Amino acid sequence: MLNNSSIKLKVCGITSSKSIQVAAQKKIKSLGFASNTLLGPNTCDDEMLKELIEECNEYKIEAVLLSRYQSTFELIKQIDYTKPKTIACSYFFDKSDFQTLKKLFKRLRIGISINPERFNLKYLKSISELVNVFYYDLNIYTKDNIKTFSANDCKDQILQLKNLKKPIYIGGGINPNNAKAVIRNTQPHG
């Protein structure tokens, strides 16, 4: 029997206050908010992100901002305005950019969003000391399409990430039919 009690649930794609209230009732401790700088569904502009993140703070729910800004300056402005507890960045940043973020936002947790087509272990090792968490997305979003990989296809990459000794959250394409298999095969943090 699989024990899922140690798996932490993080729900992403939150776009409304009602969803935050439901999450609080269900005792979900972490919610992800996708910036409209990302491709894909369920995104919000910075003003809405700020409001939703403030509401999360009232419920003591960790707010994770998923962003795709490619310049450090744009990302700093977005973090300063929306004030998330955690940021999930795309692959665009150098080690020095993360050092700048750590210097400016001392309490900010930094996550890296990874997908099966953008996996570079050498890069991930080089920034690992500055990163708090990895978010591995089985989905790849383009303007008009979502391509989903199975966790089994990505198992080797996920296991390589686990060797970096950071929490790993797996998302995208997870549903009631495959959740147990994903957990059993990859043993993620959440």
Per-segment meaning from a language model:
Residues 52:
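Aromatic/hydrophobic pocket-lining residues that form π-stacking "cages" and hydrophobic walls in ligand
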Residues 34-39, 55-178:
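Conserved anion-binding
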Residues 22-28:
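A short, Lys/Arg-enriched amphipathic alpha-helix followed by its capping loop at the start of a domain
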Residues 30-48:
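Glycine-rich, proline-tolerant flexible connector loops at the mouths of alpha/beta enzymes
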Residues 23, 87, 182:
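Conserved, mostly hydrophobic/aromatic
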Residues 1-14:
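N-terminal amphipathic alpha-helix/helix-capping segment at the start of soluble metabolic enzymes
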Residues 12, 167-190:
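C-terminal active-site rim and adjoining tail of enzyme catalytic domains
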Residues 17-21:
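Short N-terminal binding/cap micro-motifs at the start of the first secondary-structure element
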